[in-house]
Amino acid sequence: MATLTQKQNAPKKVFAFRWSGVNRKGQKVSGELQADSINTVKAELRKQGVNVTKVSKKSQGLFSKGGAKIKPMDIAIVSRQITTMLSAGVPLVQSLQIIARSHEKASMRELMGQIAADVETGTPMSEALRRHPRHFDALYCDLVEAGEQSGALETIYDRIATYREKSEALKSKIKKAMFYPAMVILVAIVVTSILLLFVIPQFEDIFKSFGAELPIFTQFVIGISRFMQHWWYVIFGGTAFAIFLYVRAWRASQKVKDNTDKFILTIPVVGMILHKAAMARFARTLSTTFSAGIPLVDALISAAGASGNYVYRTAVMAIRNEVVAGMQINVAMRTVDLFPDMVIQMVMIGEESGAIDDMLSKVATIFEQEVDDLVDGLTSLLEPLIMVVLGVLVGGMVVAMYLPIFKLGDLVG
């Protein structure tokens, strides 16, 4: 019985329908409507005085964005749209319905339509969001719930929108920072492999006709080329298999994830970027949750999860344990030996002045700017580095292949 009731109360899926018909004046009209079924479309149009002649479900084209996957940035944009409409005096349900009708993605229209339907029937916004954990995490829902309880949903949604926008911008910067080193390595591997497998063997055949002893450097390069030709399937197959095993272990084992988090923080430049990004996320999350009225002890749990790294997650949970025991947060931060003195001093000033959320927001802004600067610097550094790496690889092999030709020229001369 409970299962039947649950099914009956489950939110209906919303689809896009194309329709055409005749209005009360006898004029032909057509358009699109979001609804859960063709019957609902016909019923809604009858209320508007339209005699429906044709209704069909709108199909998604091959390159249409309609059925695209919902991304975190979509949620950030929707959060900002809700903030704008609430500040303009539009009721929450109507705001959700407007987004559900107008969004370009069918998946987002369906999601927002379900949330709007739930809220319209009396379900609290936070509870309606909790039914979609893939798109709205616990932190998001907790903040909305805090806004509902305090009667300041508009203010809270403004903070949520800002938080999500900053988080996505930071995530994008981190991806960019990781992308460039990966591209340098990939390009170097591809170029080297092509030269060793296809170009060097051509020269080797030419050198055999010389019948002369080759320079040491040329012999060394040809030896590597022969090794690659005979064992390329083992090299590439073994590498692919090792990557597969690592990815599988990473997904299955928390310990592997934790060790990976520790390792990447030690990588030059990239590790520094990730350190600063983790501190920015910690400060931004703690500022947002604390300013929303969530108790500091609970806010620290959210900040630990949002830090995105095992080292920082463990450190923040250790800070929380000290705070639970009665220690001030700035003193607790000193015990983990991870945060810079500047951060600890700003937190201490915030505690003493009663404006810890403002100070943490400033800390987050500082580190977000530092991440921006580091990523831009890394980009500027790697552009010439790619040229140098390729120049050394290609140039070295070209020299190795032309040394015998120069030597032959000297002998002839």
From Swiss-Prot:
Coiled coil: none annotated. One of its GO terms (biological process) is protein secretion by the type II secretion system. The chain crosses the membrane at residues 180-200, 227-247, 286-306, 386-406. It is a multi-pass membrane protein. Disulfide bonds: none annotated. It is found in: Cell inner membrane. Keywords: Cell inner membrane, Cell membrane, Fimbrium biogenesis, Membrane, Protein transport, Transmembrane, Transmembrane helix, Transport. Its main location: membrane. Belongs to the GSP F family. Involved in the translocation of the type IV pilin. This is Type IV pilus assembly protein TapC.
